[in-house]
Structure formats: structure tokens, C-alpha cells
A protein has these predicted regions:
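Iron-sulfur (Fe-S) cluster-binding modules
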Residues: 1-175
């Protein structure tokens, strides 16, 4: 899709997908861009006491409660809390790898035990801050894709091709 936006770059860090999506959701609901850093509260923070990060934002008069979990153990805690109805969120991001893709198995290893995901994530957010485009919806290639093929965001064609449905599977007990 050609040159990307800073919002696309931060997909690799925990909280980045949520932040990028909220930027565009704000635009789609208000017709105006927010401050590019308006949703940075969803970014993962080091040494958090809770297994996930949460925040609430106003989008055109509707409060959106968000949660971001990094690592499958933390995701398990979040999912349990949701199932127990201890918490409620309209929007959840789960990154399987600690720190997001920046901490994933495809990253270089230097032989030390030092975790580099947090440092890599900070670099991604810095790249976003310095990017000429900071919003996914302003990416010219994405705009052309919608204009020439998908019609508009949330159109029937876009929903059909870009979104998926999840269904619970009933599995037989282990034998």
C-alpha cells in the first residue's frame, strides 16, 4: 500500500492498533482529526500493576471503554474478568506477544536476557511522532483503495472483505 502512516507503524507495539483505530474512529464520528496523541493513554506502560491497560474516551458524545492486554497470560486475566462481568469494554486489543509484535518471535535476538520489546515499542511511537502522516484514514493508498474498490469505510463491501465474524466452537472433551 505504498508509504504508510505513523498510525500504521505503531501497529507493532502494544496499544498501537487501538490508538490508530481510535484516531480514525474519532475522525469518522466527528469529521475532524483529533490531536494525534489524544489516545496515547492506551499505550502499554512498564511496570503496570494490572495485567491490562484500560481507558475511556468520548467519541462524539459516546463513551468508549477500551482495554489493551499484552501477552497471552495477561489476555487470559482480561478475558476472565470480562466473562465474570467484573469489567465491560466496547473495544479490546490483545497482542499475543509481550510488547506486541515488537516483542515477537520474529525479532532479532542478541544473546542477552534483556527484553527489548519496550524499547522497540518506544521507537515505533517515536517514528509515528515524526511521520508526515499520522492517521490511517489519510494514507493516500488507503484512500484510493476505498475510492476505487471498497466504496467507503463501513460499506457493505468493506465489511465483507475486511472484517471477520467469530463463533464459539464446541469442542469434545479431551480423551
Amino acid at each position: 500500500l505504498g508509504n504508510g502512516s505513523g498510525a500504521g507503524v505503531i501497529f507493532g507495539a502494544t496499544g498501537g492498533v487501538m490508538e490508530a483505530a481510535l484516531r480514525s474512529a474519532y475522525f469518522l464520528t466527528t469529521g475532524e482529526n483529533p490531536s494525534a496523541d489524544a489516545f496515547c493513554e492506551v499505550r502499554a506502560a512498564e511496570n503496570e500493576s494490572r495485567p491490562w491497560r484500560e481507558a475511556a474516551f468520548d467519541l462524539a458524545g459516546t463513551t468508549i471503554h477500551c482495554a489493551v492486554a499484552s501477552g497471552l497470560a495477561n489476555a487470559r486475566h482480561l478475558i476472565r474478568a470480562i466473562k465474570r462481568r467484573e469489567v465491560h469494554y466496547e473495544f479490546v486489543e490483545i497482542m499475543a506477544c509481550p510488547g506486541g509484535c515488537a516483542g515477537g518471535g520474529g525479532q532479532p535476538v542478541d544473546g542477552t536476557d534483556r527484553e527489548k520489546a519496550a524499547d522497540r515499542g518506544k521507537v515505533l511511537f517515536r517514528l509515528d511522532q515524526n511521520a508526515p502522516l499520522r492517521f490511517s484514514h489519510e494514507n493516500p493508498a488507503v484512500q484510493a483503495l476505498y475510492r476505487e474498490y471498497l466504496d467507503e469505510p463501513c460499506s457493505h463491501r468493506a465489511e465483507e472483505l475486511l472484517h471477520c465474524d467469530h463463533f464459539a466452537l464446541q469442542m469434545d472433551a479431551a480423551r
